[in-house]
A protein has these predicted regions:
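Non-catalytic DNA-binding core/recognition domains of DNA-processing enzymes
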Residues: 1-4, 18, 100, 143
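Proline-centered turn/helix-capping motifs that create local helix->coil transitions or kinks
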Residues: 5-14, 112-117
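Basic, Lys/Arg- and aromatic-enriched nucleic-acid-binding interface segment
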Residues: 9-68, 76, 91
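Short functional hotspots where side chains directly engage DNA or cofactors
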Residues: 16-17, 54, 77-85, 162, ...
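Residues in the recognition helix of alpha-helical DNA-binding motifs
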Residues: 18, 68, 146, 150, ...
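Short, basic (Lys/Arg/His-rich) helix/loop patches that form interaction surfaces
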Residues: 41-48, 57, 98, 110-121, ...
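Alpha-helix N-cap/start motif
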Residues: 61-62, 70, 180, 191
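Well-ordered beta-strand positions in beta-sheet-rich domains
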Residues: 79, 95-99
Length: 197
C-alpha cells in the first residue's frame, strides 16, 4: 500500500480508517522444574508458596495467588477453590475448582504449618495485597522485583513473562496427561487461549 502511495498510483490509503486486530499473544518460555527447585532453595517460606502456586498450581500470579485463603483449601478432597479476580465479572466465573497437584501438596502442607494459624491467606504477605488495593491494582503488588532478586540469589537467568511462563509450563505438563478441556477448567482459561501459549 505504501508503494502505491509513493508511486502516486493512488492518492490516499483506502484502508487508513480500518482498524485491524493485532495479536496480543506473547510467547511464554517453558520453566523446567530444576529451575524452580533452585529458586525454592533460596526462597523464604512466603516465596516458596508463591512459586509453588504459580508453577505447580498454575494460578495466575499475583491475582489468584494473593487471593487464595486457607478456607479455599479442601485438604480431605485434595482440591482448591480458586478465586478468579481477573474474570469474576464474567457470568458464571469468579471461582474455579482445581486439584491440589502432588507437586504442590508438600508446599501447601509446609506453609500451613508455618502460617495456617497466623494468616487468613495462603500467601502470608499482607504488604502485597495492600499494594494491590491501590489505583494500579495487581500490578502494584510488584512481585516481579522480588522475583528478580530471587533469581539473582539462585544464580538463575530470568525468562520472559516470569509468572505467565510458570503458569503456561504447568498447563503444558498437565496437557500431556489430561484432556485439554479438563486442564482448561482447572486453570481457568479456554482451549483457544491454552493453545496460544
Amino acid at each position: 500500500m505504501h508503494d502505491a502511495l509513493d508511486w502516486k498510483i493512488i492518492e490516499e490509503n483506502p484502508f487508513s480508517k480500518v482498524r485491524t486486530q493485532r495479536s496480543t499473544v506473547k510467547v511464554n518460555e517453558f520453566v523446567p522444574r530444576e529451575v524452580v527447585d533452585k529458586l525454592m532453595k533460596k526462597a523464604n517460606p512466603v516465596w516458596k508458596v508463591i512459586l509453588g502456586l504459580s508453577r505447580y498450581g498454575g494460578l495466575r500470579t499475583p491475582s489468584e495467588t494473593l487471593s487464595l485463603r486457607w478456607e479455599d483449601i479442601d485438604w480431605e478432597m485434595n482440591r482448591m477453590s480458586i478465586p478468579e479476580p481477573k474474570v469474576e465479572h464474567h457470568e458464571g466465573r469468579g471461582i474455579r475448582s482445581c486439584p491440589i497437584f502432588p507437586e504442590l501438596r508438600p508446599i501447601l502442607d509446609e506453609a500451613f504449618e508455618i502460617f495456617g494459624d497466623k494468616s487468613e491467606y495462603v500467601v502470608a504477605a499482607p504488604q502485597y495485597r495492600a499494594a494491590a488495593n491501590t489505583a494500579m491494582g495487581w500490578k502494584n503488588a510488584n512481585l516481579r522485583s522480588e522475583m528478580t532478586r530471587l533469581l539473582r540469589r539462585a544464580g538463575v537467568s530470568g525468562w520472559p513473562r516470569l509468572f505467565h511462563s510458570m503458569r503456561a509450563s504447568r498447563q503444558t505438563e498437565l496437557q500431556r496427561e489430561f484432556p485439554l478441556h479438563v486442564v482448561c477448567s482447572w486453570l481457568g482459561n479456554s482451549p483457544r487461549i491454552a493453545q496460544q501459549s
